[in-house]
Amino acid sequence: MKSLFVAGTGTDLGKTHVACALLEAARAGGLSVDAFKPVVSGFDPDAPDDSDPARLARALGRPEAWTDVSPRRYRAPLAPNIAARLEGDTLQMDDLITDCREWLIGRDVGLALIEGAGGVMSPMTDEATNLDLMVALGLPVLLVAGSYLGTASHLLTALEVLRARGLSIAAIVVSESLDAPDLDQTLGLLRAFEHQATILSAPRAGNWDAGSLVDLLMA
């Protein structure tokens, strides 16, 4: 089983967009897949179909499985620890790690994705960040960046931090940002500074085919 952690250089850059496209392309290629997002904030229980868990569940071909995809769901569109506190919960990193490990143990699929919340250093609990969860799990990272002005600094900083903590980068996907500079120009800039991991792009126009990403990750 190929297991990956889908992380972002920031918030709302397209992690779920990339993860869904990857899952759909993998399924189209005959792979069995599953996905897990251990905690999500900004979740409206009255409109679950628009949520990240529901999008991932649809990409899995199991649209009713969003409760399994994300067992910890909070309403407020804030950092998970703050959103949880508003509902009387306190998130603990040990619990999130256990959730992810138990989920991984129970999988028997070709490709399993765990998607984080926010960016690499986004707080997950009152004392720990997304990075702490990633380090504890030790999975290769599929890193998603935007194409906005300033993304080079954010991406290179994230790569430096991830590698300093011993994490490997499976691939980098640049998810096209709205009203951003030319995508190809941005890709050229990023590739001039990052020579280890393959950088692919995920255009927003049309339906992005992630088949090349599947081939790269499963090789």
Swiss-Prot record:
GO molecular function: ATP binding; dethiobiotin synthase activity; magnesium ion binding
UniProt binding sites for Mg(2+): T16, D52, E115
GO cellular component: cytosol
Cofactor: Mg(2+)
Keyword Transmembrane helix: no
Top class in the EC scheme: ligase
Binding residue positions for ATP: D12, L13, G14, K15, T16, H17, D52, E115, G116, A117, G118, S175, E176
Family assignment from sequence similarity: Belongs to the dethiobiotin synthetase family.
Pathway: Cofactor biosynthesis; biotin biosynthesis; biotin from 7,8-diaminononanoate: step 1/2
Catalytic activity: (7R,8S)-7,8-diammoniononanoate + CO2 + ATP = (4R,5S)-dethiobiotin + ADP + phosphate + 3 H(+)
Complex and partners: Homodimer.
InterPro entries in the record: DTB_synth_BioD, P-loop_NTPase
Catalytic residues (positions): K37
Pfam families associated with the record: AAA_26 (PF13500)
Name of the protein in question: ATP-dependent dethiobiotin synthetase BioD
Record's keyword terms, sorted: ATP-binding, Biotin biosynthesis, Cytoplasm, Ligase, Magnesium, Metal-binding, Nucleotide-binding
Name of the coding gene: bioD
Residues engaged in binding substrate: S41
HAMAP family cross-referenced by the UniProt entry: BioD (MF_00336)
Protein origin, superkingdom: Bacteria
EC nos: 6.3.3.3
